[in-house]
């Protein structure tokens, strides 16, 4: 494998320390995969404040090196594109602080960083050749492959690490703290959990688990303002709004090309929520109704035909982009509405508006379904207060020093790790407010500080380590204000993006909410369940996507509805619902 494909980065206290004092934790050396590599060095470390007692290695200043295989995470900031390997190579005070804190736990990291677009292939190659990393990002592997690794004894249970090798902090966190739910929800049939994942927790003013951010269908507020229109509140009014946009050539293109971005093959675009139907993402046919604790499918919902008829009417009127070219048409100032995180501002970036026109501005809308067969209140997509991520990080059987892994886990659940990951360094990437809030330094010149102002550290979010995000009520209030304030530098110096913040102010206590993702926190499927899922998913998904698309485009008739439902049942939709219900019940401790 070429050096351009893999960047092997060793984080060591010194070359002498490596050669004279310690062998690496993994049984395979850094060159055991037969690849060329680039190596760099930096002082490793971390914090020990929350560990009950220093380990012997920490007390004597000794450091054990753990090898982690993961993605070389990249991001684009004002200074240009940056990557985790850039940080490791030097020049990032935030990463240097991460290394220093980690060393206080007696741990250093050797990183095998692989470009994201090559990672899945490298993972599969690594499995065939033999795993040589102590910890591995196994996110790209499918469920069956992960179960096979467990059956083959190639993954060490997280239970073993935290119960027998933690010095206290990780054991408490995953036994009695916020990680206990994760351990229960991700447990396999043997009762053990074999990978860590990200945990996001949003607290309310009583420091209890509340709710997170929201996703919403959004419409161009600047176009509404240009025509003196109020935001639509019903699906009928959305039709009238689109008619006004096109008839008045609101984007000044000379053509009736103002359109909505709506997926025609699945229920991921947010409009189905206004009919009381839960959101399913591409390739998924069920969702969890957290109000009732039941797994449902959009196809069996009482308002499904009404939803299809509405979207078809939008398409027939020429109000929907059927080209699947969202980014291109958005940049060309043609996308009138889309679905995304309600407060974020990245959709406005890169849109070119005519000279003299107001800057692009997407504002959330909540629509009551005018043609619903069964009247319902609009449902909103909200992130749950306790949210597990989709990334997976496993300890492999190649690791020879689980005590070092236990100390690493102790660091991961510490406030030091969380603050470095989310905010970086005080007075470098954030300032601490009198009310205890973390305020990003928005005009930082350093690229790593710019990244922390826009997101989180590059070592997490599908890179090498899990993310533990804890938002206090004050953090959330600061973030909400940030949504509005962002608009002050994006064309609205007086008001900012006030409609984005107003949405949260108005709907935070709204009664009718469903998770923003289709199937939150399903327990891992059993081998038997996986066999069934694998045998039915391909044909079932293909049929569903083709059917929905053809019904919306008028290529198939709604008159044959009973036949379609019989086909879905025959292809296994009822089986899929039953399996996912059992998985949800297990995750909730009800089975």
Residue ranges, per PLM feature:
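Bacterial N-terminal signal peptides that target proteins for export
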Residues: 1-12
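Extracytoplasmic/periplasmic substrate-binding proteins
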Residues: 72-101, 146-148, 202-218, 225-231, 265-474, ...
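Conserved small-residue motifs centered on glycine
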Residues: 419-546
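Conserved N-terminal structural module of periplasmic/extracytoplasmic solute-binding proteins
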Residues: 10, 25-218, 223-237, 282-287, ...
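Loop/turn elements at helix/coil->beta-strand transitions in domains of secreted/extracellular proteins
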Residues: 62-66, 104-109, 129-134, 154-156, ...
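Helix-loop-helix "hinge/cap" segment bordering the ligand-binding cleft or interdomain interface
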Residues: 159-161, 190-193, 197-269, 288-334, ...
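C-terminal motif of bacterial Sec signal peptides marking the signal peptidase cleavage site
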Residues: 20-24
């Amino acid at each position: 494998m070429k050096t351009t494909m893999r960047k092997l980065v060793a984080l060591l206290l010194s070359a002498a320390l490596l050669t004279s004092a310690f062998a690496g934790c993994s049984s395979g050396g850094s060159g055991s995969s037969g690849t060329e590599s680039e190596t760099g060095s930096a002082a490793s470390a971390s914090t020990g404040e929350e560990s009950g007692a220093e380990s012997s290695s920490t007390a004597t200043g000794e450091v054990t090196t753990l090898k982690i295989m993961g993605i070389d995470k990249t991001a684009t900031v004002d200074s240009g594109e940056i990557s985790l390997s850039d940080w490791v190579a030097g020049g990032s005070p935030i990463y240097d602080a991460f290394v220093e804190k980690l060393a206080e736990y007696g741990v250093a990291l050797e990183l095998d960083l692989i470009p994201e677009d090559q990672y899945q292939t490298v993972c599969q190659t690594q499995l065939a050749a033999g795993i040589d990393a102590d910890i591995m990002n196994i996110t790209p592997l499918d469920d069956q492959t992960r179960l096979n690794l467990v059956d083959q004894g190639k993954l060490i249970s997280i239970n073993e690490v935290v119960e027998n090798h933690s010095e206290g902090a990780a054991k408490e966190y995953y036994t009695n703290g916020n990680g206990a739910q994760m351990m229960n929800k991700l447990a396999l049939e043997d009762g053990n959990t074999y990978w860590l994942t990200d945990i996001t927790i949003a607290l309310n003013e009583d420091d209890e688990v509340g709710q997170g951010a929201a996703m919403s269908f959004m419409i161009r507020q600047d176009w509404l303002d240009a025509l003196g229109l109020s935001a639509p509140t019903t699906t009928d009014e959305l039709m009238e709004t689109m008619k006004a946009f096109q008839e008045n050539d609101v984007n000044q293109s000379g053509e009736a090309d103002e359109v909505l971005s709506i997926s025609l093959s699945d229920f991921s675009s947010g409009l189905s929520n206004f009919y009381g139907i839960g959101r399913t993402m591409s390739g998924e046919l069920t969702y969890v109704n957290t109000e009732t604790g039941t797994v449902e499918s959009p196809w069996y919902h009482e308002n499904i035909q009404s939803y299809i008829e509405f979207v078809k009417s939008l398409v027939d009127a020429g109000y929907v982009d059927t080209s699947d070219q969202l980014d291109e048409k958005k940049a060309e100032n043609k996308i009138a509405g889309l679905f995304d995180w309600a407060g974020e501002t990245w959709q406005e970036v890169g849109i070119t508006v005519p000279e003299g026109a107001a800057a692009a501005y997407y504002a959330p809308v909540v629509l009551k379904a005018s043609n619903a067969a069964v009247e319902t209140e609009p449902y909103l997509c909200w992130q749950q207060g306790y949210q597990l991520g989709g990334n997976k990080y496993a300890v492999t059987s190649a690791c020879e020093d689980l005590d070092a892994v236990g100390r690493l886990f102790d660091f991961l659940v510490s406030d030091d790790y969380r603050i470095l990951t989310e905010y970086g360094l005080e007075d470098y990437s954030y300032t601490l407010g009198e009310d205890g809030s973390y305020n990003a330094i928005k005009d930082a010149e350093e690229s790593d500080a710019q990244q922390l102002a826009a997101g989180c550290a590059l070592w997490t979010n599908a890179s090498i380590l899990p993310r533990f995000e804890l938002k206090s009520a004050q953090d959330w209030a600061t973030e909400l204000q940030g949504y509005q304030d962002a608009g002050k530098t994006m064309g609205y110096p007086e008001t900012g993006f006030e409609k984005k913040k107003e949405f949260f102010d108005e709907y935070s206590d709204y009664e009718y909410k469903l998770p923003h993702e289709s199937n939150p926190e399903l327990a891992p499927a059993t081998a038997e369940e996986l066999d069934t899922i694998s045998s039915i998913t391909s044909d079932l998904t293909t049929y569903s996507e083709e059917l929905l698309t053809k019904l919306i485009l008028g290529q198939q008739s709604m008159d044959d509805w009973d036949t379609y439902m019989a086909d879905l049942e025959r292809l296994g939709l009822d089986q899929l619902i039953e399996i996912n219900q059992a998985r949800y019940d297990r995750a909730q401790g009800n089975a």
